[in-house]
Amino acid sequence: MAPINGSRNGKHSKPQRGGNLKRKRVQEDLNSLIKKVEDLDVKETIEQFTDLPLSEPTASGLASSHYKTLTDIQSRAISHALKGRDILGAAKTGSGKTLAFLIPILENLYRKQWSEHDGLGALVLSPTRELAIQIFEVLRKVGRYHTFSAGLVIGGKSLREEQERLGRMNILVCTPGRMLQHLDQTSFFETHNLQMLVLDEADRILDMGFQKTVDAIIGHLPKERQTLLFSATQTKKVSDLARLSLQDPEYVAVHEAASSATPSKLQQHYVVTPLPQKLDVLWSFIRSNLKSKTIVFLSSGKQVRFVYESFRHMQPGVPLMHLHGRQKQGGRLDITTKFSSAQHAVLFATDVAARGLDFPAVDWVIQLDCPEDADTYIHRVGRTARYERDGRAVLFLDPSEEKGMLKRLEQKKVQVERINVKANKQQSIKDQLQNMCFKDPELKYLGQKAFISYAKSVYVQKDKEIFNIKELKLDEFAGSLGLPGAPRIKFIKGDDTKERKNAPRATAYLSSDDESDEEGEKKKTKKDETQVRTKYDRMFERRNQDVLADHYHKLINDDGTMVETNKATEDADEDDDFLSVKRRYEAGDKDLDVGGSSSEDEEDADGTEKKGAKVVHLDGKEALVIDSKRREKLLKSKKKLLKFKGKGTKLIYDDEGNAHELYEMEDEEQFKAKGDAKEQQAKFLAEEAERTRQADLEDKEVAKQKKREKKEKRKARERELLAMEEEGGDLVQIPYKEGGLASDEDEEVLRPSKKARVSFADEASEEEPKPKKAKKSQPAGKAPEQIETLEDLESLAAGLLG
């Protein structure tokens, strides 16, 4: 008979047999795959993905995503990674480095039969959020047939939602900052079982910007792991490799022997243009290339915002977008998506978009500001000419930057050709920018911040052969932005300290006199009413009254004119600090001691007190002199009057009522006059012992007296009870108080302890509460009885006893 659940046992059990066969077949395929990987020759050049020893889910994902042919970096790196070796991979931009580490991640975890119960198996670190999103999208396409759980952990999203899902992830793609936050704050997130660590754009992650963060992350990870590093400009520093605990890494540099570090189909040019003409040349370029897809790189986010807002108002005829690190994550993602799908557009961006991002069909890469080094240049131009496509790049250089930058590019095998701008095609937009800044104070403020951020980006660079802020025409550059004058730049010290020190004193004295004269003229009324004032003069003199008024006021001179670059104004700028001393106090100043009276109010020049001053003595060493209204206010402040009051003394009083100090000490001479110290000690001990004995006797006598009184009260109560029994009267309970029988006065005090009941009966009924009290004293549950004889009393006592 078959079981209740309908299943069969014995030789006809087909489902169980089929399950065993399937598990056996999967295990055989896994063993075969492991053997193929072990037999793989890393020196062999593999061109097709079908020739690699890959699992069925990975092969199906590659075929569905239309990946068929391997690139050079993929052919050389995947073989070493499948065997579990650490890799340092360096290849040109757009050469397919992402698949070179994603395929080994999927395969190594698949061969180990990784599941959600095993925890985190692979961690991929990316320097930017956009690159992390791009890596995650490729992982989703290639690993769609695997059963692994993958997650994206970047800033700008809800931390709590990420914490809830983090414990179930097998593969994580993240940015360093958010990953460290989870390692420190998410309690159930464990990384002790990590198998692979991947650093994309490793040179950027390992530099000074992420050094502390990456060191902290590595401190949470196990040392026994496989580490893969990929970048277009790879690091070989021993210190960096030691931090990552690399074990005999394999250096895979595909294009190390190539003649150029950039893609072969990339056309690279540079234009020497003065700093004040950069925006004019950029505008002319955009107007002449409306049917192109262009990325324009600038050095700071404030420059990106200003150029985007100003060009957007002028409407060049092509869609404009901007991308920088201060934008919210949702906005950044929308912009990257729109620019990727756009056919013709211009994207103004910082170096956030310089690494790893794959924007399809980018025609031009314009570097409006000089990159900080040759590696940054390589990554910027790598946004075009990807995957063997054509691309063009143009670098804008100031004459002071040309020689040093070309030297750095030659050291990195980067060859750039110089081109000239046709003067007849160049358009000037200086007047348009001035008009917009005049009408829009917010755009004017944005231009001032853009100017300061550019100057700061040049000032902080270490390579002074390229970046020398003293050789830049900053005043003319401010005018090209539409600003009425160059904003203050407090971090630029102007001339050297040695030059200022050797300058003649007369020059500094005259400049200080001129400044004081100018300040005096400000206080006077305007006398030059007949002078003609144009609308531009009024524009420069007006003050903003909107939300940006305070910020705008900090960026210009107090008179609204442009900042002059002479020594006097530079010294004045140095004195105009964020914190200024309102009043300086010296040691011994009476204002500081007493609370703020001026020296003129206190004393005359000869040190005598003023006439009519009042002197108040408050039992202190110093008398209070009241010679001004400010001093008179001291009388209302108890805290400030404490200085003029003497210190209080604590007194005790003896039995006779005489006051004594708390501690009355004898002089040394008086003490010696009384005799030897040991004799005085023995005498004192004897006196104290006698005093203690007498006090003990008195206490014992008091205790005996209390005990005697208590005994007498108890006997008096017993005698009273016996007398009542002999008389045969009613038994009345006498109130008992601790220590003896209660007196008549005690009874009177005890009786009104309960509130008298309010009764509406007649007066006769109000006189009957006394016998009721006697009845209440009887035991509960028994009716009161009249005791007439001794037998009745004995029977009542027997009943009470039991």
Curated annotation (Swiss-Prot):
Residues holding ATP: A91, K92, T93, G94, S95, G96, K97, T98
Region ranges (Disordered): 1-24, 494-538, 589-614, 685-802
Keywords, in A-Z order: ATP-binding, Helicase, Hydrolase, Nucleotide-binding, Nucleus, Ribosome biogenesis, RNA-binding, rRNA processing
Short motif (DEAD box): ranges: 200-203
Coiled coil: none
Biological process, per Gene Ontology: rRNA processing
EC identifiers of the protein: 3.6.4.13
Cited SUPFAM superfamilies: P-loop containing nucleoside triphosphate hydrolases
Catalytic activity: ATP + H2O = ADP + phosphate + H(+)
Function: ATP-dependent RNA helicase required for ribosome biogenesis. Involved in the release of U14 snoRNA in pre-ribosomal complexes. Required for pre-rRNA cleavage at site A2.
Domain remark text: The Q motif is unique to and characteristic of the DEAD box family of RNA helicases and controls ATP binding and hydrolysis.
Entry protein name: ATP-dependent RNA helicase dbp4
Originating species: Aspergillus niger (strain ATCC MYA-4892 / CBS 513.88 / FGSC A1513)
